[in-house]
Amino acid sequence: NFGIAQYQDDPTSHEFLDINSFMEWLLLDEHKGYSVLAHNGRGYDFQIIMEYIYKHTIYKPFVVYAGSKIMILVIKELKLRFVDSLNFLAMRLETFPKTFGLTELKKGFFPHFFNVEENYYYKGKVPSLRYFGYNSMSVKKRTELIKWWVAKRATNYEWDQFAEMKSYCISDVDILRRS
């Protein structure tokens, strides 16, 4: 539903509203020889990318699997590689800033379970805690979330789902790029 790309040495974000626009951009000749990194891409992103490649291109990618998970995907004709950074950075993305001394960066909170098509353009109160995966968080993380959420609600913060999603994605990509 939304994607962000950044070049390794350039923090400028390239924004895409769907997989088609992202892949059309990525498959341009200027990206030959590039590597595309996604943290935990094996679990979601690479499945969508591979589906696009098979449905909309003539390429037959080389794929390395671990079970049903895509560890690496290569379009040989373009020398374009899709690599899951979890293969060599076996930690949660939220730990990257501290691990790599990027003190100005922090992975924020996002209501992943609220991120469905009918809510893409929602504006209103900060969504309920349940949409943030509250029940699957560590006690420490849950405490941080509650503190953040209560502060947002107390100030009548207007949640703009699309703007928040964009900001969250840019932050994630920036954390990965700079790490």
Show the residue positions of the predicted features.
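Metal-dependent nucleotidyl/phosphoryl-transfer cores and adjacent nucleic-acid-binding surfaces
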Residues: 1-179
